[in-house]
């Protein structure tokens, strides 16, 4: 007969088993989340003898559950008794690595690699390497595909030269596997494997593998082999060896019949350039770069556009001006808007390298062209990078060249473009000075307060405070405050609301005199507005004014003028108005 303690010991595993077999997937997922708690309750021995075998046998479930299990098992070494017993986790993970769903297999591979790090040499050779070999020679491609991700961990952990030779040979078979679904992960992992072998082994064994994969009949394999070339270039280091082994494959990549392969080269061009060194860049990489900029496929041109700043950093200024800038000028009028948008985001970064004179001569005209682009994303990208150019050429020159276009964009039909311009205004204002700003941009800033998009009105209000801090209180009192206060009588309540929001935003930059003479009369009028939203926002504005008046040492204005108005609002018919008015009064009493 079982004792009470024995029953209690069995209870957690019984509950877990019940929940793992539950019809509802949420119960099964919850059970897996508590797996470590159950393992702690069982102790290492029972976890090894009961829990792990049970999990191993129950691998026949929905992908979400299997993925969670694969993830959990990677962190289970301590629960089975530490590294000495880590190998007991390999069996369920091997089964998970053979499943059909890629997400599950990837999680299983990650967990197997975690466990591998904990294994002793004996465990590695007795359990892990045979597991890798079994998966590599399995009938189903899913197992072979998973095995590709295990070789780096096994190889780096092994200290046995014979085992290492065996692993390299087995990996070579994966790179020549009949299924492209296996060759793809083999190519991905080959780029990592290269760093684990000697330089001579890389030349003798991995360059032939690279040549095979880079000439694969499947473009999905070829494009993944580009990273192998980058890795090999880093391992070889020598200019002569890189020229001998990798130059022809690079030319083949750039002229590959598949645009997806060329895209991969374009998107990672700087990564390759940084590892081959200045001599090869100058002699061998400029022409491929230009060819990709002129590629027939727009996605390739877009990808190479993102590489322009990074690649040009590695070139002499003269080469940039002679070889790269003319092609950029062609791309400014590219028929694909995504290419132009990528240019807009990236060409500004050339300004520091080109310097003031050449930026003015070459980049500013291109900026102006892109600021007039029909696509809003292109315009937006250029605006977002104006500050980089400003640091090189100065705001005066920038504003002279681009101000007309900026003013036009301030009224752009796309609100995100208008918003980007608003964000840029304080920088312009600071550099241009008050007279120039009032003449060219003052009315523009006020017009945004009446924009039909709330985000624009909100940004415009925040701008008013920044401008007040730049130009001073006197300027604000004479120029902007009368204009936004005049909106208190606007027939549309949204614009009356803008007046209140502007008061709340700008108040900390004002003094008690301005508040008493200009702000309070407006709020007194709006206290009786027919719209409840207006009235309760007036109450919130009063709350903002208190610390400003207190800082000025004038509490009588608040006590004699504002408190009576708040008390009036506490008796309002609308409960929201009552609430915010009461809250403002309570703040007053603190």
UniProtKB/Swiss-Prot annotation:
Keyword Transit peptide: no
InterPro entries noted in UniProt: ARM-like (IPR011989), ARM-type_fold (IPR016024), HEAT (IPR000357), HEAT_type_2 (IPR021133), PP2A/SF3B1-like_HEAT (IPR054573), PP2A_Regulatory_Subunit_A (IPR051023)
Keywords: Repeat
Gene Ontology CC annotations of this record: chromosome, centromeric region; cytoplasm; cytosol; FAR/SIN/STRIPAK complex; mitotic actomyosin contractile ring; mitotic spindle pole body; nucleus; protein phosphatase type 2A complex
A single MF term (Gene Ontology): protein phosphatase regulator activity
GO annotation terms (biological process): asymmetric protein localization to old mitotic spindle pole body; establishment or maintenance of cytoskeleton polarity; meiotic centromeric cohesion protection in anaphase I; meiotic sister chromatid cohesion, centromeric; negative regulation of septation initiation signaling; spindle assembly
Subunit-structure text: PP2A exists in several trimeric forms, all of which consist of a core composed of a catalytic subunit associated with a 65 kDa (PR65) (Subunit A) and a 55 kDa (PR55) (Subunit B) regulatory subunit.
Free-text function comment from the UniProt entry: Phosphatase 2A affects a variety of biological processes in the cell such as transcription, cell cycle progression and cellular morphogenesis, and provides an initial identification of critical substrates for this phosphatase. The regulatory subunit may direct the catalytic subunit to distinct, albeit overlapping, subsets of substrates.
Domain note: Each HEAT repeat appears to consist of two alpha helices joined by a hydrophilic region, the intrarepeat loop. The repeat units may be arranged laterally to form a rod-like structure.
Family per record: Belongs to the phosphatase 2A regulatory subunit A family.
Name the record gives this protein: Protein phosphatase PP2A regulatory subunit A
Source species of the chain: Schizosaccharomyces pombe (strain 972 / ATCC 24843) (Fission yeast)
The gene coding this protein: paa1
């Amino acid at each position: 007969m079982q004792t009470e303690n024995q029953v209690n010991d069995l209870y957690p595993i019984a509950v877990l088993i019940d929940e793992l077999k539950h019809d509802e997937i949420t119960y099964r997922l919850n059970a897996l989340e508590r797996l470590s708690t159950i393992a702690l309750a069982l102790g290492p021995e029972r976890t090894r003898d009961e829990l792990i075998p049970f999990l191993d046998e129950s691998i026949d479930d929905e992908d979400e559950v299997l993925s969670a299990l694969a993830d959990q098992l990677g962190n289970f070494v301590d629960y089975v008794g530490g590294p000495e017993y880590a190998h007991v986790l390999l069996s369920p993970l091997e089964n998970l690595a053979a499943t059909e769903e890629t997400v599950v297999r990837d999680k299983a591979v990650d967990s197997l690699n975690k466990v591998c790090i904990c294994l002793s040499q004996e465990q590695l050779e007795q359990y892990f390497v045979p597991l890798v070999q079994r998966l590599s020679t399995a009938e189903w491609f899913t197992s072979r595909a998973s095995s590709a991700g295990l070789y780096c961990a096994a190889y780096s952990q092994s200290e046995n030269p014979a085992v290492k030779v065996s692993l390299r040979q087995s990996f070579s078979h994966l790179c020549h596997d009949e299924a492209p679904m296996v060759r793809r992960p083999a190519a991905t992992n080959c780029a990592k494997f290269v760093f684990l072998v000697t330089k001579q082994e890389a030349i003798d064994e991995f360059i032939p593998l690279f040549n095979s994969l880079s000439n694969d009949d499947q473009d999905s394999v070829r494009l993944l082999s580009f990273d192998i070339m980058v890795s090999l270039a880093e391992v070889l280091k020598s200019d002569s060896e890189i020229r001998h082994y990798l130059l022809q494959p690079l030319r083949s990549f750039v002229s590959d019949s598949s645009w997806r392969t060329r895209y991969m080269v374009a998107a990672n061009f700087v990564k390759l350039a940084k590892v081959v060194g200045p001599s090869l860049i100058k002699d061998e990489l400029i022409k491929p770069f230009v060819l990709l900029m002129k590629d027939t496929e727009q996605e390739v041109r877009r990808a190479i556009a993102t590489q322009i700043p990074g690649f040009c950093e590695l070139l002499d200024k003269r080469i940039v001006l002679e070889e790269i800038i003319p092609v950029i000028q062609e791309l400014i009028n590219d028929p694909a808007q995504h290419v132009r948008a990528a240019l807009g985001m990236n060409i500004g970064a050339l300004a520091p390298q080109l310097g003031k004179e050449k930026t003015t001569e070459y980049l500013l005209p291109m900026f102006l062209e892109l600021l007039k682009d029909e696509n809003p994303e292109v315009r937006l990208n250029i605006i977002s990078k104006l500050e980089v150019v400003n640091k090189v050429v100065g705001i005066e020159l920038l504003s002279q060249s681009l101000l007309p276009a900026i003013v036009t964009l301030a009224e752009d039909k796309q609100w995100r473009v208008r918003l980007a311009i608003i964000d840029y205004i304080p920088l312009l204002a600071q550099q241009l000075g008050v007279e120039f700003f009032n003449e060219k941009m003052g009315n523009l800033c006020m017009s945004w307060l009446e924009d039909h998009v709330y985000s624009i009105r909100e940004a415009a209000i925040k701008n008013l405070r920044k401008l007040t801090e730049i130009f001073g209180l006197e300027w604000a009192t004479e120029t902007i405050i009368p204009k936004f206060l005049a909106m208190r009588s606007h027939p549309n309540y949204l614009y009356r609301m803008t007046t209140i929001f502007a008061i709340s935003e700008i108040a900390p930059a004002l003094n008690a005199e301005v508040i008493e003479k200009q702000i309070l009369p407006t709020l007194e009028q709006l206290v009786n507005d027919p719209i409840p939203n207006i009235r309760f926002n007036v109450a919130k504005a009063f709350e903002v004014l208190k610390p400003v008046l207190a800082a000025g040492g004038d509490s009588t204005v608040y006590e004699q003028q504002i408190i009576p108005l708040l008390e009036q609002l506490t008796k309002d018919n609308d409960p929201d108005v009552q609430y915010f008015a009461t809250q403002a009064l309570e703040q007053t009493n603190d």
